[in-house]
């Protein structure tokens, strides 16, 4: 489509490159709305007619927890205790509670497609058209992964870049803050994009100072939150995934080399490659999550190729094929995996829930052999049954690391792990297991685990742990008499120091006695006199300041 000149008395809105806009606003708006409509329609089909995404179960449970208990800092029903929302998403679950997971997902997909189209059209004009449309298609498919907070954060990040294009710094600041509140990972990727732009436009330094200051301030705020609510977990990052990132970034940088209009894109590839190498070298809760840019690999590749007019064509075809594979492979895997999971209905889990309600006491928790769809992490804790695991892989490390061992799972190490976490029963289903649960399922099915099968239905089996160790152990008889999301009550017959198999946090407070962390990160409770002791999570300024300073707050009560 030829360019249509526009005569106007007003200066055009500034783009990131500070060059005049080359297309009419009406043309940009029309294409953006069409892209948003297409993305929203496709997302609607996938979210309502397709299988639930791989992460859908996690968000379903977290939304339930928010509806039932509000914004809690802690949850005892996953991973022997963990921080709930504060370092993951501050605003997604309140929004999901109001609008529902599926409707919110469709809305955020449509908004992202709208903003992406506007941003690229303002920056690159008609050359961005095919990139806009491929984004509308592939971004809608992200609902198959169930990465809904990330999708929300990405929509807000794109709106932030749009605000920056129009020169509205205060809107950019607000939207950048909302991006961080929706998804720290989306904020991190926004930082990479802006860093690439900043390097490419370094001659416009003064214009970049305010946006850079905003990003640094928000990044500092996120770092403080992670310091205050550190969980010590890490997310794996395989060398195979790193290799795929490297190929994508090196190819992208090569294709945009000496293409002046693609200068911001070239530096994005370089900055992103450096960030991924750092994430691989430094174990953290980020890990492989840093490669989420793969979900837009196709539109990014199409943009890079369009800016060089798809020359040479053989190289362009190979590049697009590689980008398509990297973009769509995890989505296709998630689609197939969740389509084969029969465990998404509550009726599937009801026999196990009924049995556990009749036999499990508060002094023990349950291990559910994780399924491909992770629905055990929804229906069992919803029923008030505390789990040794859940669905937030970062929290599997280090306490559940042995389940990921490449050397198989032995009977002795498995029993020791079950005893260390106060597990009384193990639930095994006929649903396809998660990759981290294959060795565990195989051991149980072999009959050599040392556990006794105590219940079996068409889909579910329950095994009893021999000589189970309760959640609380110490010098005298003791029991857990009450357990909720952020509170636990124990009864001890003798004074002394007890081990409580719940993860320590500096925000735990006991009604009487003293709290300390053990070497295994579990609570050590010093009880001065026999009786009941209630532990609850209390987040206040004094404890937060001490946690930030790396000091243990005074945790003794009279």
Where are these regions (language model features)?
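Transmembrane signal-anchor helices characteristic of membrane glycosylation enzymes that use polyprenol
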Residues: 27-56, 221-222, 323-328
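Extracytoplasmic
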Residues: 330-558
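Membrane-embedded helix bundles of polyisoprenyl
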Residues: 39, 110-119, 127-167, 171-199, ...
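Transmembrane catalytic cores of multi-pass membrane glycosyltransferases
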Residues: 51-58, 62, 69, 73, ...
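Active-site lumenal/periplasmic loops and adjacent helix-entry segments of GT-C-fold
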Residues: 43-130, 134-154, 184, 342, ...
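Start-transfer (signal-anchor) and selected internal transmembrane alpha helices
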Residues: 1-44, 557-558
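Cytoplasmic membrane-interface segments at the C-terminal ends of transmembrane helices
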Residues: 22-23, 114-128, 161-169, 193-211, ...
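Signature aromatic-anchored transmembrane alpha helix within multi-pass, membrane-resident enzymes
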Residues: 309-328
């Amino acid at each position: 489509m030829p360019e249509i000149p526009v005569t106007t008395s007003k200066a055009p809105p500034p783009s990131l490159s500070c060059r005049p806009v080359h297309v009419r606003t009406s043309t940009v708006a029309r294409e953006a709305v069409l892209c948003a409509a297409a993305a929203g329609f496709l997302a609607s089909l996938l979210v309502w007619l397709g299988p639930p995404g791989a992460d859908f179960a996690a968000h379903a449970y977290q939304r339930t927890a928010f509806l039932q208990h509000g914004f809690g800092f802690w949850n005892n029903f996953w991973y022997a205790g963990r921080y709930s929302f504060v370092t993951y998403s501050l605003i997604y679950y309140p929004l999901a509670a109001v609008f529902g997971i599926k409707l919110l997902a469709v809305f955020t997909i449509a908004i992202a497609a709208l903003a992406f189209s506007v941003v690229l059209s303002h920056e690159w004009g008609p050359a961005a058209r095919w990139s806009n449309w491929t984004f509308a298609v592939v971004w809608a498919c992200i609902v198959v992964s169930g990465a809904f907070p990330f999708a929300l954060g990405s929509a807000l990040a794109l709106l932030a870049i749009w605000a920056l294009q129009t020169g509205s710094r205060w809107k950019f600041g607000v939207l950048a803050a909302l991006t961080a509140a929706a998804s720290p990972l989306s904020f991190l990727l926004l930082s990479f994009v802006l860093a690439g732009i900043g390097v490419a436009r370094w001659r416009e330094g003064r214009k970049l100072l305010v946006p850079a200051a905003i990003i640094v301030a928000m990044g500092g705020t996120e770092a403080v939150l992670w310091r205050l609510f550190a969980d010590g977990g890490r997310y794996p990052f395989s060398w195979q995934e790193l290799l795929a990132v490297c190929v994508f970034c090196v190819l992208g940088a090569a294709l945009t080399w000496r293409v002046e209009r693609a200068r911001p894109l070239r530096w994005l590839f370089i900055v992103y490659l450096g960030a991924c190498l750092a994430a691989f070298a430094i174990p953290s809760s980020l890990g492989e999550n840093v490669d989420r840019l793969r979900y837009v690999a196709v539109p990014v590749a199409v943009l890079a190729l369009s800016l060089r007019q798809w020359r040479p064509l053989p190289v362009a075809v190979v590049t697009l094929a590689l980008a398509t594979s990297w973009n769509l492979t995890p989505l296709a895997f998630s689609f197939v995996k969740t389509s084969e999971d029969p465990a998404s209905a509550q009726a599937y889990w009801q026999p196990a829930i009924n049995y556990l309600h009749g036999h499990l006491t508060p002094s023990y928790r349950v291990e559910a052999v994780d399924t491909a769809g992770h629905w055990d992490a929804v229906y069992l804790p919803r029923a008030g049954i505390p789990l040794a695991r859940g669905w937030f892989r970062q929290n599997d490390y280090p306490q559940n690391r042995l389940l990921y061992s490449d050397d198989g799972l032995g009977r002795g190490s498995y029993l020791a792990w079950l005893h260390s976490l106060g597990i009384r029963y193990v639930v095994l289903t006929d649903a396809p297991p998660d990759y981290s649960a294959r060795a565990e399922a195989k051991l149980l099915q072999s009959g050599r685990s040392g556990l006794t099968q105590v219940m079996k239905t068409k889909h579910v089996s329950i095994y009893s742990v021999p000589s189970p160790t309760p959640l609380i152990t110490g010098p005298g008889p003791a029991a857990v008499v009450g357990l909720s999301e952020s509170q636990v009550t124990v009864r001890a017959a003798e004074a002394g120091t007890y081990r409580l198999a719940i993860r320590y946090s500096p925000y735990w407070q006991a009604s009487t006695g003293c709290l300390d962390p053990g070497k295994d990160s579990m609570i050590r409770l010093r009880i001065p006199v026999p009786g009941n002791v209630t532990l609850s999570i209390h987040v206040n300024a004094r404890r937060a300041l001490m946690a930030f300073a790396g000091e243990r707050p005074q945790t003794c009560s009279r």
